[in-house]
């Protein structure tokens, strides 16, 4: 897998390729417990992990912003407590931006900070939501009002997840690609200019 270093107060690597299972198993080595938080809409696509001695716990949440709530977060806290999660254990978030935001904030707030890994499965998640360490949940007064900066230990981008997206969802994520291009590198826009969604996905 290709690796890109992200330098910050809590530096980490973004791995890009097609073998996220191997990468997760490697980072879970030496842990006693691993929590896998995922979208219920993806339940059939989430494998039963063999973390080589670490006990795996699975927590499915409602799809999209509906699952990114303080109530869901409280359920995760209770679940982590019942399972005996300690500072040396690991949280993994597999899904779109709502899932990685929630998993990251659960990690930030439990015992003042657990390691966590983001496995984004959408274009927007791969380009924006899982990168940078912004984590949080929504409240009844607005989106992302409760949160913290807590960078992941690792971001694992498996390009195979893109094959599961509809053209509509794929195209929606390209808006984040365009935004990133304007902010960071306008040459990115050349990859999209004059192309339809079919040709972009093919390449």
Regions found by a protein language model. Give the residues of each.
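Short glycine-/acidic-enriched loop or helix-start segments at secondary-structure transitions
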Residues: 45-48, 102-104, 128
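Active-site-proximal helix-loop elements at catalytic-domain edges
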Residues: 52-54, 58-68, 186-203
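Glycine/serine-rich anion-binding loops at beta->alpha junctions
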Residues: 89-111
């Amino acid at each position: 897998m290709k690796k890109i270093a992200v330098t910050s107060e809590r530096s980490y690597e973004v791995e890009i390729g097609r073998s996220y299972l191997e990468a997760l198993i490697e980072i879970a080595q030496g842990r006693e417990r691993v929590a896998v938080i995922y979208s219920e809409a993806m339940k059939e696509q989430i494998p039963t992990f063999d973390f080589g001695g670490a006990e795996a716990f699975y927590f499915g949440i409602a799809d999209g912003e509906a699952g990114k709530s303080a109530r869901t977060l409280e359920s995760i806290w209770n679940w982590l407590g019942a399972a005996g999660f300690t500072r040396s254990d690991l949280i993994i978030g597999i899904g779109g931006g709502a899932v990685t935001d929630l998993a990251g904030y659960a990690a930030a707030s439990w015992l003042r900070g657990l390691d966590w890994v983001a496995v984004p499965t959408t274009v927007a998640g791969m380009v924006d939501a899982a990168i940078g360490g912004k984590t949080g949940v929504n409240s009844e007064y607005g989106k992302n009002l409760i949160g913290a900066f807590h960078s992941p230990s690792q971001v694992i981008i498996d390009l195979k997840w893109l094959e599961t997206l509809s053209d509509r969802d794929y195209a929606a994520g390209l808006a984040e690609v365009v935004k990133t291009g304007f902010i960071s590198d306008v040459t990115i826009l050349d990859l999209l200019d004059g192309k339809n969604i079919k040709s972009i996905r093919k390449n």
